[in-house]
Amino acid sequence: MANSYRDLIVWQRTVEMTLALYRLTEEFPKQEMFGLTSQLRRAGVSVASNIAEGWGRQSEGEYKHFLGMARGSNMEIQTQLLIASKLGFGDPEKLTLAEQLSHETGKMLVSLMKKIRSRLPFLFAVNCSLFAASQYSLGYIFDMR
């Protein structure tokens, strides 16, 4: 079990992907500095950051929400890489590597989201039971029967 978001293979893969995006976009035309270059870099950082932020949230529901945001940013990357490819931007090998890392990241995010989703009904039931028990206990303590 992971003790930190840094232990998650999906987070590690996302950092690797982001570095690949930075290396790829170094070769983009200078006029793309505030276009595809900026968009790809920001989306890569967003994927890794959302995984980390979700890890630090209070509930698994919030964590899943941030994983969904990470997945959305990863989809942006895939779209932007396709556009860059069609425009002939970047080294083809670096482009292929970034595409592969993005697809792997996407699969890993979906897998992690499914794992969390399968645990949510159980956690909800446990939380409801604890809430009901605490209400009964408070009623008894304060004679609120």
PLM segments and residue spans:
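Short, C-terminally biased terminal segments at protein or domain edges
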Residues: 1-53, 57-145
